[in-house]
Every structure is written in C-alpha cells, then in structure tokens.
Amino acid sequence: MTYENNTHQQNGAGTADIESRFANMSVQNGAAGGAPRKAYVPPHLRSQQQPASLNSSAASFSPRAPAAFNGNGNSNGNGNGPAAPAAPAAFQSFNRGAPRGGAGGWDAPSSGGYGGARNGGGYGGGARNDGFGQWKDGKHVPGPHNPRLQKELFGEEGDGLHQSMGINFDKYGDIPVEATGRDVPEPVTTFTSPPIDAHLLENIKLARYTNPTPVQKYSIPIIKLGRDLMGCAQTGSGKTGGFLFPILSALFTHGPPPPSAAEMAQGGYNRRKAYPSTLILAPTRELVSQIHDEARKFTYRSWVKPAVVYGGADIVTQLRQIERGCDLLSATPGRLVDLMERGRISLSNVRFLVLDEADRMLDMGFEPQIRRIVEGEDMPGVMDRQTLMFSATFPRDIQLLAKDFLKEYVFLSVGRVGSTSENITQKIEYVEDDDKRSVLLDVLASMPSGGLTLIFVETKRMADMLSDFLLRSKIGATSIHGDRTQRERERALELFRSGKTPIMVATAVAARGLDIPNVTHVVNYDLPSDVDDYVHRIGRTGRAGNVGHATAFFNRGNKNIVRDLIELLKEANQEVPQWLEAVARESMFGAGGGSRGGRGRGRGRGGASSFGNRDARTMNGPSSGGGRGFGGGYGGGMGGGLGGSYGAGAAAYGGPPPASNGGSYGGNSSWW
C-alpha cells in the first residue's frame, strides 16, 4: 500500500512538473526582444481558468445589441447570431443566412443585419458572393454578379448544352389556345416588365429565352391575378416556365409572405424546420431535379433560395441544403412526407402549390401522399393559397382531384391536349421481337450524326441488355432505370446531356418531364400499353419548337393501342402506314367498344364524349355517345360542382383584380 501511495504521489508530482514546464514554454523563449506570450494551458485544465481572463480575446464573439441582430456569424459560420428579444417580429421563413462557412449575417455588419420588422433588415444572401440577393427595407436588392455561377447556370452561347429556341419556334403562334373560366385575362405577347419583375427579366434574357410559349403567354397573367389554374399543354411547351415566371415575379416584387401562426408560435427562428412559401410536387427524382435546376437559374441573384428533396439520395445532404434556405421547394411526395414526419418541413406558410405531371403522380400511386400533403397537414386551405396543376393530359381522375384542390380555376388548353407536336416526324415500323436489334442498328445508322437518341424499353433488364448490345456493336450507349442508384442515374444523365454518350436506353422512369436539350431522335423499341405513355415518350424530342424524329417498333403484340395510335398520327398530320390500318381492322373483331386496352384509363380524343382536353365544367349535359374513354355519364354530374366561391380566400397576388368582379378575388388586398 505504501509503495502504491508513494507511486501515486510521485506520479502526481511528475504530472504537475510536466504541466508547469508546458505552461512556461513559448516559441519566443530565448529570442531577443520577444513579446511576452500567454502561458499554454492544456485542454483538460482550461475549464479551471477564470472567465475574466478571456474577456479581452472574446470581444469579437460577443453578441450584438438587439438593434444589430444577426449582424455577425456565430461560431459555426451559419450566419445566425444569438436570438434577440424581438425575434418574433423579425420573421424568418428559415435560415436564409450565409451558407456554411460564410461570414454570416443578413447584411454587412454596419447595417445592423436583420433587425426590427420585416421592412427593416436584410432578408436573403450572405456576406460572400454566393449568387443570392436580399429583401431589405421592403425592397428586393439583387446580389452581385458571380461569373462562375452564371456560367454554370446559363452556360455560354453555342455550347450546345442549353436549348432555348428552336427553328420552328415562331410556328407556336398558330397553335390554338382555349382558356375557359370567369374573367380570363388577356394573354401577354412578349417578355416585358411589367408583368414580369425586372430582375427576373434579366435572368430570362441570360437563359436566352426570347419569346414566351403559348402556355406562358396565358399562364403569366392568369397566375399574376391570383387565379388557380389547370394547364394542359403539349410536352416541351414551356410548362415549367409557365408557373415559375409568375410565381417568382410575385415573390421578387412583394417579398416574403408574413409568418404563419405556427411559425410565430415557435418565435420564427426554428432553424431545424423549413417554411417554404412555394411548393412544387412532381412524380420523379429526375423531374424535380430538373425543376430545381430551372429555379436556380431564375432565382439567380435574388432573395429566393430554391431547394430540392427526393427519395433515393442522402437525406442528410438534403437537410443541410434546406438549412441554408428553403423558400421554393421542389419535392417528390414520398420524401416530402418523410421530412414532414421528421419535423423538418412545415407547409403552414405555403402560398403557391404546384402539381406538375399530376396525372403521372396519380398513375404511380401517389394520391394518398398528395392528399395527406395538401389536406392532412398544416398547408393553408384551398381559399388561402394559389394552386396550379400542369400536365400534358388531364384524364377523369385528375379533373376530379381539381374539385378538391382548386377554387374557380381557369382551364387552359394549349394545342390538342394529349396529341403530339407536328415538329416531330413519326415513323411506325413493323418489326417482330427477334428482329428488333438488327433493325435498331439500321435505324441508328440512317439518322444524321450530332444529336442525341433516346431509346425506350419496357423492362429494366431489357434496358441493360440493349445497352450492352450497343456497346458490343461499338456504339456509345448508357442506360437508366429504377434499379440504378441515384448516383448512377445522375451520371448516366450527365454523360447523355453532354453528348459524351449519344444514346441512352431508358425505361418509363425517364419518360416524363425530362427536358434534355438536343434530343433529336426517340425510338420506342418496346411500345407502351397506353398511348398516353407513347405521347410522353416521343415528347422528349421536338421540344421548344425544335424538329425531332420518333421511330416505333410495332408488331401484333401491340394491337391494344393500334386505334389510338392511328388517331394520334392523323391528328399530328403524320403518315399512317396501310399495314397499320389493316391491323386496326383486324383488332376491331372481338374488341370491346367501351374502353381502351392496356390499363383501361382511356382518355378519349375528340368529340363530346371525351374531355381530356375539355373543361369539365362546360359539360353540363349528358355526354353524347358511349364510346372510348369515359364520356358516358360523367358530364352531367360534374358540370356545376367544380366551380365554387372564390371570394373568401386569398386575393389577387400581383395587381388589381378584373374590373368585372367588383373587387378582389379574396377577402384581403394581398397576402402581404
């Protein structure tokens, strides 16, 4: 025991002696004229130091006075200083401070940061040139130009990676447009300010968009007036810009909306929960990523911070992104529900709800999640938000959904809904399954070089097999399907977009919504069972007025869509092979007269019995005919019910309401 005690005492003395020596060490020891330095304190002894000894060195980390709240970054560099007593009055949708590692703050330190009421301090970008601006003193203050980011977002003229205007773009002026509803405003004809915010107009010019498409000509004034909208337009017609332009114009002009009650209850400073003011739902990872990329372009140098969340990717990375700012959120329904359950996103401050490719979301089984998001959480009701639904088709189930989600909307039909663009030259080849590979090689060899070719197949296994076959044939190809990891999918898309791999084999996962520039040829190696899917597949080419080619391999295994396919070809003024009409006559014997084959979700085309391209509210009488689609019996019950009162909720967003209304479209002059 004595030996052990002596040992402990010796060890204690030795430790103290070593610590004393460390404390007296200095890099200046022995140097002539060296200034005295503070003694080194080992980490385990630093807590024993008196706080007073740190006062002088901690001055730069002291919290600012309340009047200069958030003017300085905290120790993490997240741009948020200590909370001030007046925090609830200084609404913060989410952490809109500088990105991690920045100097922090809402403004330069001399201006007091984000202090006082909403029209006081800054609201938006950080101290470094991160491509964001601010909302300060009730005004939108664009950030400085960032050449590197600008090149990343908008590319350079002639780089081939950013398609904006095709050679047939002016023909869009001849496309018929039908807008039904009460007090539909006149369309715009050019990109001008007003109605488009001046800063957004600069970004549109950077994107080299010169003329609005038909859907944009109508959607911009409709959305500006605070109206709900159902927009039907052919693929590649500019639907994304059709809702982004008016939404961003309103946000740039009016600034962030006031905090919701839920936000105020938490003091407005809950950094762990995002409160987006705009929510865009889309069915696939690729589509929400594409929408987010467009949003990044048009929010460049603005106070609005876009974010994107989707399944199949690292959720921690996405959480970090929304922590840096989440004013405009693009999301897939499944991942959004996940983040809401985690308490990381609240929809209580949503003023704009956009459902893009709405019919495909329902086809993919997302209706329960969509209804939970819109009706089962804290999103404002239909009268207190503006809801926009965009898609290439609006079958019956979507029109029924509109009854619950939209208020006295404008129905916008641009061109023949569900039809294909005349810019696409369609060719149907009769090919037996065993001959498809050899015929594909002939088709690819006959096409001019320089463009991208997208080949659609029905199964994931076939996508990989066909891609391998092309590679063995010395043809550069890649594949994309649902079993690929998100990293693999993004890599394949990157190679395809850049032209390094000019051919991509895809399943339906890439069939909808993807806007890949310079796709000049689409091949339906396997025809889908529904003609709507065919429409969306070939819609990957001929976008924005450009000319495209579509080739389909047909055999008698595809008889279920032959009649709709013929009708589609005739609508687009395409050649109909005689053998295809012969197959159609064969299929008439023994075929039922009610619904289309395949999934049986037939939309019907033309005539009073179909309304995929018709406003259901105009169909008050019984439908004529009982043929394809679902014309029989639907019109009478739907006619008067989709409307409803429009006066109890939100007001006209971006200007005075139409004079014929006798007032605004809502109970208040604006959301602000």
UniProtKB/Swiss-Prot annotation:
Biased composition (Low complexity): 56-73
Keyword Hydrolase part of the UniProt annotation: yes
Helicase C-terminal domain ranges (all copies): 423-584
GO CC entries: cytoplasmic stress granule; nucleus; spliceosomal complex
Residue numbers spanned by region Disordered: 28-88, 125-149, 590-627
Composition skew (Polar residues), residue ranges: 46-55
Pfam families, A to Z: DEAD (PF00270), Helicase_C (PF00271)
Residues annotated for ATP binding in this entry: A233, Q234, T235, G236, S237, G238, K239, T240
Catalytic activity annotation: ATP + H2O = ADP + phosphate + H(+)
The Helicase ATP-binding domain, residue ranges: 220-412
A single GO BP: positive regulation of formation of translation preinitiation complex
Molecular functions (GO terms): ATP binding; ATP hydrolysis activity; eukaryotic initiation factor 4G binding; G-quadruplex DNA binding; G-quadruplex RNA binding; mRNA binding; RNA helicase activity; RNA strand annealing activity
Compartment annotation: Cytoplasm
InterPro entries xref list: DEAD/DEAH_box_helicase_dom (IPR011545), Ded1/Dbp1_DEADc (IPR044763), Helicase_ATP-bd (IPR014001), Helicase_C-like (IPR001650), P-loop_NTPase (IPR027417), RNA-helicase_DEAD-box_CS (IPR000629), RNA_helicase_DEAD_Q_motif (IPR014014)
The keyword Endoplasmic reticulum appears for this protein: no
PANTHER family: ATP-DEPENDENT RNA HELICASE DBP3
Entry domain remark: The Q motif is unique to and characteristic of the DEAD box family of RNA helicases and controls ATP binding and hydrolysis.
Cited function: ATP-binding RNA helicase involved in translation initiation. Remodels RNA in response to ADP and ATP concentrations by facilitating disruption, but also formation of RNA duplexes.
Protein name: ATP-dependent RNA helicase DED1
Source organism of the structure: Mycosarcoma maydis
Lineage, highest ranks first: Eukaryota, Fungi, Dikarya, Basidiomycota, Ustilaginomycotina
